[in-house]
Every structure is written in C-alpha cells, then in structure tokens.
Swiss-Prot record:
GO terms for molecular function: ATP binding; magnesium ion binding; UDP-N-acetylmuramoylalanyl-D-glutamate-2,6-diaminopimelate ligase activity. The keyword Repeat does not apply. It holds the Pfam family Mur_ligase_M. A motif (Meso-diaminopimelate recognition motif) lies at residues 419-422. It comes from the Bacteria. This is UDP-N-acetylmuramoyl-L-alanyl-D-glutamate--2,6-diaminopimelate ligase. PANTHER family: MUR LIGASE FAMILY MEMBER (PTHR23135), UDP-N-ACETYLMURAMOYL-L-ALANYL-D-GLUTAMATE--2,6-DIAMINOPIMELATE LIGASE MURE HOMOLOG, CHLOROPLASTIC (PTHR23135:SF4). It comes from Parasynechococcus marenigrum (strain WH8102). GO terms for cellular component: cytoplasm. Carboxylation is probably crucial for Mg(2+) binding and, consequently, for the gamma-phosphate positioning of ATP. Its EC number is 6.3.2.13. Coiled coil: none annotated.
Length: 500
C-alpha cells in the first residue's frame, strides 16, 4: 500500500522507539514464510506457539521490521539496534489494528455486518448476501464455506481468518466494488482478536447453546466471548445496529444490555421489533408475514424448519437497519434455496423419487442444532424418522450424551457412528454417546460412517426420512491427524442408487 513504517505505527497510536528507521513497507504478514524485502512481520501469538519467535527468520528474509509481544521478546530478546518493536498486551489487538491501517481501513469503505452465535451463522450470512445482491447492493461474504465478492470466490479454511489475512481480503472486496459484507464471526475469533481492526456497521446474535466448552470452559465465558461483537470498538453508534434473537435466553440477556441499540427478533413475542405471524408450513417451505419497524409484508420461502425462519427474520432485519427497502427484500426471500449441507436433500440424477426414502444432510453438530434439524425433518415424513450421527473427537465431551438423548427422543431410529474422531478412540466416543440413550431406543451402532449411512438408507422404506447429521458441507473425515476425503452427500447418493 506504499505506507511508511512510522506512518503506520502513528496511525494506530503506537510509540516509535528511538532510532527506528522509517522504510516504505512492501507488505505485511504474520507468516514468516511469506516475508519478502521490505515486509513488516507481525509476530502473532497463538494458542500452540508464539509467532513472534520467528522474528529473526523474518529479518533474515528481508523484513524491514518486526512487531512482537513481550513473551517472544523475553524468549529471544532483540538487540537495541534491530528493527523490532515490542508491543504491549493485548498484542493480537494491536496487530489487527496495524493490518487494518496498512490496508486502508477497508471497513470504512463498505458496511460490514457480523453474525455470531452457536448455530445459524452460515445460513444467515448467506441470506444477507443473497438478499442484498438481489436488491442491487454488491455484497461480499466471509464464512465457513466460502469467501467471495464480485469477481472472486475461494473455499474458506476457517470461519474467521487471522487478522492480517482478513484485512487483506476485506480490502480486496472493497476494491472490487462491494458496498456491504456479511461475515461469520466465531467465538474463537473474538477471543483471539482476529477481527481487531474491523468496525461493524451491524451485528446479529443467532443463539447460544452448548458447544466449544472444551475451549471456553463455561457457558458464561462462551457468552462473554460472543457478546464482544456488540461492544465498542467493534460495534459502535447510537442508533439500532444489532439484531438479537429474543427467543433465546442468552439473546434476551444481550438485548437487555444493548437496550435501544438492538432490535429483538421473535417468532412468538408480540413485543419484539421483528416478528413473523400468520405462518403456514407446507411441503414446499413456509409462507407468512414479517413485521418490523420499517413496515410489514408477506413472504414465501422454500427453507425448511422453524429455526430457518429466525435466520431469515434476522437477515431481513439487519438489512432494514442499513436502510434497504422491505418490499424488494421480501420478494428476494423466495429465490434463496438454502446453503450446501444445511437441510440439503440428496437425490439421484437431480430428481426426487417416490420409490426412495427422503434423505437430508445437515451440519447439526450441537445439541440445539440436532434438535432443530430433527424437528424440522418430522413434518416431511409419513414413515419413520431415522437419525445417523456421531460426535467429534478432541472436542466438548459433555454434549455427547445430550445429543444422544435428543436423537432418542425425536427420532424413531438412531444410528450412532463416527464423526471426525481425530486422535480419540472412535469406540470410546461412541460409548460416550450411547451412554446417553435411554433404554428402549431403536439403536444401531456402526463405527464406519460410510457403512452406517448405507445401511440406514438400505433399511429405510420409501415413506421414511433419513437425516444424516454432523458434517453437512464437509468433504473430509479427520482420522487421527490425517484428513481423508469423505462426503455424506456422496455416500448417501451412492446408497440411494443401490436402491434403484
């Protein structure tokens, strides 16, 4: 961007060490392997190791300077004449601000909307993108599945990228003409300051249910992480700029904290600013009326499930806060067909068949997500509801018996299998799940996920519905430390073909 080191440091309020040279910077990066002549190396502290420890390698590779944290400086103290700036804590926040400044503060050039919550982030951000584009506003999307903007698209590797890469992507999106951007913001990203340097014009809280307690420890800590998105300097301003799920107990708490700065969304509270009424569920989706401070109107959506109504309500609501017109937004709702791996129907040769069971693949991997997916599936079967699921290894063990109890309560038949066991013993994970099943559950256990899917579909009648939960869009399994190709949709389609 042609910025000098001194100008960059001054822009974010950092003190200049005496004698520090003022070169023109050619790039910034937190990856020492990407350093070139004139780069600024950002020594980003991480969970497993401190990237600041690589400052020497960065300088040897031609970096003009390096910024590191106190722990890296203590471990490998730089000499007084070396161009190394030691930051005060929180280091990651300063690095995010540096990245935003280097890339010209991209959030000042387009309106950034952040979506956080346990479930619903992906569908809600995709809805925001779809609706905004349909009403003529070029929009970028950052999330679990893909990062894209006008003229560019790439499969995402993380829900929220590290700060320097994120700011570079935001700058590219703004330069490509994006007027708005929808971003999934994970709790990990908020704790690790990956979105430092961002300024959000709007924010959405979808819900909070048990997940990631292996990382956060308690639900209170998990909530506090999510709530960071709704505080300055990330989200600021006097008027309504947030949409919060008022039907969620944690959302109700957040709404009370935010007061007039948020609109509450609800499917049952007549006092909420955003509501849906006169709902009619059909085999083709749902129709009803949306009520908002900007007016009301009828809508028709092909999305399945009550939980998707909340996603839709919140997406429309946050765009209304941005001043987009209600009528065109509601018209655009009907053309949104959903997100890959979210209540996605698997068919053979692109066509449904009355001779085959209905098969849905969903990313549900939390207790709340599984309950929502099963509840949404029930109206679409005249036969049995069969649930195939497992729980990930090296993750929150407390949700395993909870998911088991939900599956046993809402499904007619349950098949427990593997789901990214990672370095845990798959049989022990399955045992943890089965321990939560009440006696009398119609239960099968099959460690091999492909076999479990094939047998569940082979055993199902044409009137049954088979829900394959947990992986959704993912096209891999993590076995030990190895990632191997695996796609629930491919396995399900193959099993359906065997039925023809």
């Amino acid at each position: 961007m042609g910025q000098s080191l001194h100008a960059l440091l001054r822009d974010v309020g950092l003190e200049l060490p005496a004698g520090l040279a003022d070169p023109q910077l050619t790039s910034i990066t937190s990856d020492s392997r990407l350093v070139g002549e004139g780069s600024l190396f950002l020594g980003l502290p991480g969970e497993r190791f401190d990237g600041g420890r690589f400052w020497r390698q960065a300088l040897e590779a031609g970096a003009a300077a390096a910024v590191i944290g106190p722990s890296a400086a203590q471990e490998l103290p730089p000499a007084a004449d070396q161009p190394v700036l030691v930051l005060r804590e929180p280091v990651a926040r300063s690095i995010g601000e540096l990245a935003a400044s280097y890339w010209g503060h991209p959030c000042r050039r387009m309106a950034l909307i952040g979506v956080t919550g346990t479930n619903g982030k992906t569908t809600t951000t995709h809805l925001i993108e779809h609706l905004a584009v349909r009403v003529g506003q070029p929009t970028a999307l950052f999330g679990t599945l893909v990062n894209r903007w006008p003229g560019y698209s790439i499969t995402a590797t993380h829900t929220t990228s590290v700060a320097d890469r994120l700011q570079a992507q935001l700058a590219e999106a703004a330069s490509a003409g994006s007027q708005l951007a929808a971003m999934e913001v994970s709790s990990h990203a908020l704790v690790q300051e990956r979105v430092a340097g961002c300024r959000f014009a709007g924010a959405v809280f979808t819900n909070l249910t048990q997940d990631h307690l292996d990382y956060h420890g308690t639900m209170e800590s998990y909530y506090e992480a999510k709530a960071r998105l709704f505080t300055a300097p990330l989200l600021d301003g006097d008027g309504p700029s947030a949409v919060v799920n008022g039907d969620d107990p944690w959302g109700s708490r957040l709404a009370e904290q935010l007061g007039g700065r948020c609109w509450r969304s609800s499917l049952g509270d007549p006092q909420a600013e955003l509501q849906m009424v006169d709902l009619e569920m059909t085999g083709q989706g749902v129709r009803g009326r949306l009520l908002s401070p900007a007016g009301s109107g009828a809508f028709c959506s092909p999305l399945l499930g009550r939980f998707n109504l909340m996603n839709l309500l919140q997406a429309v609501g946050v765009l209304l806060q941005r001043g987009l017109p209600l009528a065109p937004l509601l018209e655009a709702v009907g053309s949104f067909r959903g997100v890959p791996g979210r209540m996605e129907r698997v068919v053979v040769n692109g066509a449904e068949s009355a001779a085959l069971p209905t098969v849905l693949v969903d990313y549900a991997h939390t207790p709340d997500g599984l309950e929502n997916a099963l509840a949404a599936s029930r109206p679409f079967t005249d036969g049995r509801l069969v649930c195939v699921f497992g729980c990930g290894g090296d993750r929150d063990r407390g949700k395993r018996p909870q998911m088991a109890a939900i599956a046993a309560r809402l499904a007619d038949r349950v098949v427990v299998t593997s789901d990214n066991p990672r370095t845990e013993d798959p049989d022990q994970i399955i045992a943890d799940v089965v321990a939560g099943m009440p006696s009398g559950t119609d239960l099968s256990v099959e460690r091999d996920r492909a076999t479990a899917i094939a047998e569940a579909i082979a055993d199902a009648s044409a009137a049954d519905l088979v829900l394959i939960a947990g992986k959704g869009h993912e096209d891999y399994q993590i076995l030990g430390t190895e990632k191997v190709h695996f796609d629930d949709r491919e396995e399900a389609e193959q099993a359906l073909r065997q039925r023809q």
